Design a protein with these regions (language model features):
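Acidic di-acidic motifs
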Residues: 5-6, 79, 98
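The C-terminal output helix
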Residues: 110-120
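C-terminal output helix
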Residues: 100-110
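Short amphipathic alpha-helix used as the core "switch/output" element in two-component signaling
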Residues: 57-70
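Active-site beta3 strand of CheY-like receiver
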Residues: 41-47, 51
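Two-component/phosphorelay signaling modules centered on CheY-like receiver
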Residues: 7-26, 32
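Alpha4 helix (beta4-alpha4-beta5 surface) of REC/receiver domains from two-component response regulators
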Residues: 58, 80-96, 107
C-alpha cells in the first residue's frame, strides 16, 4: 500500500489507520520518479490529486502506462467537485472526496486489495 499525499498530517493519519488495520504501508509526499515505486510493488496506490510538482491525475495516468505498475489499483483523493470525471480520465480505479471518512478509505483500500489478489 503506497500513500502519495503532500499534506503531512493527512498522510500520517491515513498511514496510521491503515497500519492499525494490519496493512503494510509506505508513504511519500511525492515520488521523485516512477522507478522508485516499482520495487515496492504496492497492492494499491492512494494518490492525492494535488501534489506539489504535478497534478495527481497526471501521475495516475503515468502509473497506468508503466509495465511494472499498470495493474496496481489507484484511488484518487481530491477536494475537486469533478473528482469522478478526473478519476475516469486518468484511469483511476476509484476516488474518494475530501474531506473524507477514514472508514471509507479503509473499506475501499481493503476491497481493492482483495479484488486484486483474486484477479492475480
Amino acid at each position: 500500500m503506497l500513500i502519495i499525499e503532500n499534506d503531512q498530517d493527512i498522510r500520517h493519519v491515513i498511514e496510521f489507520i491503515l497500519q492499525e488495520h494490519g496493512l503494510d504501508t509506505l508513504s511519500t509526499p511525492e515520488p521523485e520518479n516512477l522507478s522508485e515505486i516499482i520495487p515496492f510493488a504496492p497492492d494499491v496506490i492512494l494518490l492525492d490529486e494535488f501534489i506539489n510538482s504535478r497534478p495527481g491525475h497526471r501521475l495516475c495516468k503515468q502509473i497506468k502506462h508503466v509495465a511494472g505498475l499498470k495493474h496496481v489499483p489507484v484511488i484518487i483523493l481530491s477536494t475537486a467537485n469533478d473528482i469522478e470525471l478526473i478519476a475516469a480520465e486518468c484511469e483511476a480505479n476509484d476516488h474518494i472526496s475530501k474531506p473524507f471518512d477514514i472508514n471509507d478509505i479503509v473499506d475501499k483500500v481493503v476491497r481493492m486489495i482483495n479484488h486484486t489478489s483474486i484477479a492475480y
